[in-house]
Amino acid sequence: MLDEKSSNTTSVVVLCTAPDEATAQDLAAKVLAEKLAACATLIPGATSLYYWEGKLEQEYEVQMILKTTVSHQQALLECLKSHHPYQTPELLVLPVTHGDTDYLSWLNASLR
């Protein structure tokens, strides 16, 4: 169970999809090597449905869940966007309002 000390307003989760596992691995390795994210979770097997240029698309994708801090967020987003093969990649930032104190401390210590 989480206690009041686990409140946090400096960590964020970034969602990004990639077209395949190799691309997701490459993007994750890049942001981890540059210390822009502390952890990247890659979930293969996602199917995304969306309209693009007036046409319904359905694509196999890998969902990436990246953990970082607010202070690293912009650099992470810029890195992902500049190295991503999509013209308009999914880049969504979700605030972390609570989390395990030890995990959040590790997350902060893992970044540059």
Curated annotation (Swiss-Prot):
Single GO term (MF): copper ion binding
InterPro entries, sorted: CutA_Enterobact, Ion_tolerance_CutA, N-reg_PII-like_a/b, N-reg_PII/ATP_PRibTrfase_C
Entry's cofactor comment: Binds 1 copper ion per subunit.
Cofactor dependence: Cu cation
Main location: cytoplasm
GO CC terms of this entry: cytoplasm
Record localization: Cytoplasm
Cystine pairings recorded for this chain: none
SUPFAM superfamilies: GlnB-like
Keyword Cytoplasm: yes
Keywords in alphabetical order: Copper, Cytoplasm, Metal-binding
Residues the entry annotates as binding Cu cation: 16, 83-84
Single GO biological process annotation from the record: response to metal ion
Family statement: Belongs to the CutA family.
Entry-linked NCBIfam families: PRK10645.1 (NF007930)
Function noted in UniProt: Involved in resistance toward heavy metals.
Record note on quaternary structure: Homotrimer.
Record-given protein name: Divalent-cation tolerance protein CutA
Lineage: Bacteria, Pseudomonadati, Pseudomonadota, Gammaproteobacteria, Enterobacterales
Gene that produces this protein: cutA
